[in-house]
Amino acid sequence: MKKLLFLAAVLLTAGAASAQITYSLGYISTSTKAEYTLGGITSSKTTSMNGLTISVDDNINLTGDLNVAPGVGMDFSMRKDGDIKYKKFGLYVPVDFNYGFALSSNLKLFVYAGPTFDLGIIKDAKDDNGNKVNYYDKDLVVNYSRFDLLLGGGAWLTFQDQLRFKVGYKVGMLNTCKADNYTVKNNVLSVSVGYIF
């Protein structure tokens, strides 16, 4: 956790010294697939959480039209199932390798792919009576890892080198559940708008 926070601080410092730093606000939808295997029989359930994300990144030129955009962000998602409210808050560090194409003098298209390192801060459930469960609690029979690694890609458009419209999809590579016989993976869809300084 400390290493990821340190990396995020370094990226923020590096971005602050750049003329291409982008601040973004967006929507995310996280789809979580949980599988449980017992006696050779596997059952599965998929749930989704929706929320907001804010981030900052810097698109650094590598060569020609090839760039890399390291960044740091945070997201907050919620869902309700009956009288139970679920919420998740986390930090993430994307490293998006991208290639740009000029569509016109004012419009440019970038396609990107890369990893995202995700660190969960809060993941809990609370009912109407105030009973609360922290899914990162190691004493739970079914508890979760705070760390996740996602791979994905997408595209963004920049207008007059100031406005950015971005869409992406990332697939979780790790089983985030620590309990025996469980496999839980997350996929994330995101749409955002950003301003380039």
Language-model features, listed with the residues they occupy:
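Cleavable N-terminal export/targeting peptides
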Residues: 1-22
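Acidic/histidine-enriched, beta-strand-rich ligand/metal-binding domains
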Residues: 5, 46-49, 66, 72-78, ...
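Short glycine/proline- and aromatic-enriched beta-strand/turn motifs that initiate or cap beta-hairpins
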Residues: 19-60, 108, 120-122, 128-130, ...
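Residue-level detector of the transmembrane beta-barrel scaffold of outer-membrane proteins
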Residues: 20-24, 67-71, 108-112, 164-166, ...
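Outer-membrane beta-barrel channels and translocator barrels
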Residues: 21, 61-65, 102-106, 160-162
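Residues that define the transmembrane beta-barrel architecture of outer-membrane proteins
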Residues: 21, 46-52, 85-93, 145-151, ...
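Predominantly the C-terminal beta-signal and adjacent terminal strand-loop region
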Residues: 30-41, 69-81, 126, 138-197
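Detector for outer-membrane/organellar transmembrane beta-barrel domains
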Residues: 90-98, 104, 108-121
